[in-house]
From Swiss-Prot:
Record protein name field: Imidazole glycerol phosphate synthase subunit HisH
E.C. code: 4.3.2.10, 3.5.1.2
Pathway in which this enzyme or protein is active: Amino-acid biosynthesis; L-histidine biosynthesis; L-histidine from 5-phospho-alpha-D-ribose 1-diphosphate: step 5/9
Catalysed reaction equations from the record: 5-[(5-phospho-1-deoxy-D-ribulos-1-ylimino)methylamino]-1-(5-phospho-beta-D-ribosyl)imidazole-4-carboxamide + L-glutamine = D-erythro-1-(imidazol-4-yl)glycerol 3-phosphate + 5-amino-1-(5-phospho-beta-D-ribosyl)imidazole-4-carboxamide + L-glutamate + H(+); L-glutamine + H2O = L-glutamate + NH4(+)
Active site: 79 (nucleophile), 180, 182
Organism: Bacillus cereus (strain G9842)
Length: 209
């Protein structure tokens, strides 16, 4: 069971429809116990980083997400959800994030139009489970104005937009996609299937203990 966290700022419906399409068992919830009972978690998001953190704090979801990380449960952040995984954002007056990944979220510093919106090539930087079955250079769909300034060792895929934009990041059981898998056609469906596979593997490992 994959829990899609509903905190009022996510692209919930499109993520839910994508999971239905690939046949992944899921629930949309903001309930702590349901999240902790799940086998994997997706944190979607659209909007402003500071407001999202404020809402997560108000709903007591920050501690839940940190607990999810601590117990090794697979966690996937999408778009703003990915950005929230980092330590801090400079958006507006600046704001602390969840601190599950090292790095800071910064405004895109490019001469191109902002937000970065549309299809872009995703190039492989290093292997990790969400690359399974994908061709290096596949096109994915972005909508964002900020990017993750983070250590190279957690960057698994990048796109060019006047600068290198981390598209895929990962550290341990924590995964992030700056682009929208749920809006990226069959490539995106494969990415979500790969996450489903990670979730199933984690569930099986827990059952065998």
């Amino acid at each position: 069971m994959i829990a899609i966290i509903d905190y009022g700022m996510g692209n919930i419906r499109s993520v839910e429809q994508a999971l239905k399409y690939i046949g992944a068992e899921h629930i949309v919830t903001s309930d702590k116990e349901e999240i902790l009972r799940s086998d994997g978690v997706i944190l979607p998001g659209v909007g402003a980083f500071p407001k999202a953190m404020e809402v997560l704090e108000e709903r007591d979801l920050v501690c839940v997400l940190k607990e999810v990380c601590d117990i090794g449960k697979p966690l996937l952040g999408i778009c703003l959800g990915m950005q929230l995984l980092f330590e801090r954002s400079e958006e507006l007056k600046g704001c602390s994030g969840l601190g599950l990944l090292p790095g800071e979220i910064r405004k895109l510093k490019v001469s191109y139009k902002i937000p970065h919106m549309g299809w872009n090539e995703l190039r492989k930087e290093r292997e990790f489970p969400l690359w399974n079955g994908l061709v290096d250079g596949s096109f994915v769909y972005y909508v964002h104005s900020y990017y993750a300034d983070c250590p190279d060792e957690i960057v698994c895929g990048v796109s060019d937009y006047g600068m290198q934009v981390p598209g895929f990041v990962a550290k341990g059981n924590v995964f992030g996609a700056q682009f929208h898998p749920e809006k990226s056609g069959e490539i995106g469906m494969q990415i979500l299937k790969n996450f489903q596979g990670v979730v199933e593997a984690w569930k099986s490992s827990r059952l065998s203990i």
